[in-house]
Curated annotation (Swiss-Prot):
It comes from Rhodomonas salina (Cryptomonas salina). This is Large ribosomal subunit protein uL1c. The gene is rpl1. Belongs to the universal ribosomal protein uL1 family. SUPFAM superfamilies: Ribosomal protein L1. GO terms for cellular component: chloroplast; large ribosomal subunit.
Length: 234
């Protein structure tokens, strides 16, 4: 059994086993982010859904108002003038069949792949390469579109795709630990509002089960769900 480091033991003792209010929890998250790099702020939300049923699945996107704190590398598969349009809009890579061939060879130096609709038949063969990495373009995630500029702008600003896993848990980042508490709170509230707005139609009764946040190397901190949800529904 792996030994728990003294650093981990020390920070774990600072977290009480109770729901925290948002600002209090975020201050604690920042205090306990003591790694030698800027940690990511993560949210882990357990929902009372059974994703084996189509009407209880949750998969959607949102734009974090304060961004992710991460530099997103974007590749675009398009043709003709759309390639120049993509590069002018800030794409890091853009091409047609040449880019597809590079991806087939394992060149995946990007975080998000956007494609124009006319290129989807050609991209279909990349399913085995992109699918397991969550990089396959799809209309639902906003990565298949003719409006290349808008898509690039949104993902550069902090657009994320999230889904509930087979256990009904949503795992999503909401910034970096060097963000201000106010900015982290704004992003976290956006996450909560998006999950409520996109409540699956098949869910009856209670929806939220638990709401935890943590930093990359930090302990889990339980949030008071009612504090966030009351702001929306009061």
């Amino acid at each position: 059994m792996a030994k728990v480091s003294q650093r981990v033991k020390k920070i774990q003792t600072k977290v009480e086993l109770r729901p925290y209010k948002g600002t209090e929890a975020l201050n604690l998250l920042k205090e306990l982010a003591t790694a030698k790099f800027t940690e990511t702020a993560e949210a882990h939300i357990s929902l009372k859904i059974d994703t084996k049923y189509a009407d209880q699945q949750l998969r959607t996107t949102l734009v974090l108002p304060k961004g992710t704190g991460k530099k997103v590398r974007i590749a675009v598969v398009a043709q003709g003038e759309k390639i120049n349009e993509a590069l002018a809009a800030g794409a890091d890579l853009a091409g047609a069949e040449d880019l597809i061939q590079n991806i087939m060879k394992g060149d995946l130096d990007f975080d998000r792949l956007i494609a124009t609709p006319d290129m989807m038949p050609a991209i279909a063969k990349l399913g085995k390469v992109l699918g397991p990495r969550g990089l396959m373009p799809s209309p639902k995630s906003g990565t298949v579109t003719a409006d290349i500029k808008e898509a690039i702008d949104e993902f550069k600003k902090g657009k994320l795709e999230y889904r509930a896993d087979k256990s009904g848990i949503v795992h999503i980042l909401f910034g970096k630990t060097d963000f201000s508490v106010e900015d982290l709170l704004a992003n976290l509230e956006a996450v909560q509002e998006s999950i409520d707005k996109n409540r699956p139609s098949g869910v009856k009764g209670r929806y939220w089960k638990s709401f935890y946040i943590c930093s990359t190397m930090g302990p889990s901190i339980q949030l008071d769900i009612s504090e966030f949800r009351d702001k929306v529904f009061s």
